[in-house]
Amino acid sequence: MAGHSKFKNIMYRKGAQDKKRSALFSKLSREVTVAAKSGLPDPNANPRLRAAVSAARSGGMPKDNIERAIAKAIGGDGDNYEELRYEGFGPSGVSLIIETLTDNRNRTATNVRTALSKNGGNLGTSGSVTHGFDRMGLITYKAEAGDPDKIFEAALEAGAEDVTSSEDEHEIWTAQADLHEVAGKLEAILGEPEGVKLAWRPQTLINVDEESAGTLLRLIETLEDDDDVQTVWANYDIDDEVMERLGQE
């Protein structure tokens, strides 16, 4: 998603990531527990759990925390979380898909609706946004994993469908059904990835001007700050110069 990784870097430079470390661990822990409950509590036998554990490690979550999250699932402890997806629109008509894990759907719906309405957006109906996205597998590696040519060749050999590389990371896209097979092949070549997940890839992007971009990024940040929100997908494109200026504010 164009602009998204740069937005993450801007937030990092502002020091926001350090302040949100515990919140991040909470989200990662929740996903590990839900993934463990969805199948066997063994990452080697449960692809979703393996991906969740990989994401937790990449997020800097201590091994003990990860093991406790799995133990909650084995022991039947912890809340029962429901996976809910919301669709909406932001400034400039940008489409948003908001994936959540919640133990209180009324609270989550209210928070999502409020975040949208206060930042130039509105909640849509089911299917109002997803038709403009493709459901695909997404494997991410840091830029240091290799130059774009090396990553492209490895991804092609592993059966991926597309690769996009930036100064920060490599995004490797696969067919939905091939995600974990491709991830396994790539891990043997490139090492453990930063992330392995099912994703929503926009079919087209909307270019957002500077005024709307600031509001849009605040909206995404507000949504991602919510404890129940796991991931926000969007179809925006923001020029690099605009992103740099926003990062200096």
Curated annotation (Swiss-Prot):
Keyword DNA-binding found: yes
Annotated Gene Ontology cellular component terms: cytosol
Subcellular localization: Cytoplasm
Annotated signal peptide: none
Main location: cytoplasm
GO molecular function, one term: DNA binding
Pfam families: TACO1_YebC_N (PF20772), Transcrip_reg (PF01709)
InterPro entries: Integrase-like_N, TACO1_YebC-like_2nd/3rd_dom, TACO1_YebC_N, Transcrip_reg_TACO1-like, Transcrip_reg_TACO1-like_dom3, YebC-like
Biological processes annotated in GO: regulation of DNA-templated transcription
Swiss-Prot/TrEMBL keywords: Cytoplasm, DNA-binding, Transcription, Transcription regulation
PANTHER family given in the database record: TRANSCRIPTIONAL REGULATORY PROTEIN YEBC-RELATED, TRANSLATIONAL ACTIVATOR OF CYTOCHROME C OXIDASE 1
Record-stated family: Belongs to the TACO1 family.
Protein name: Probable transcriptional regulatory protein ZMO0153
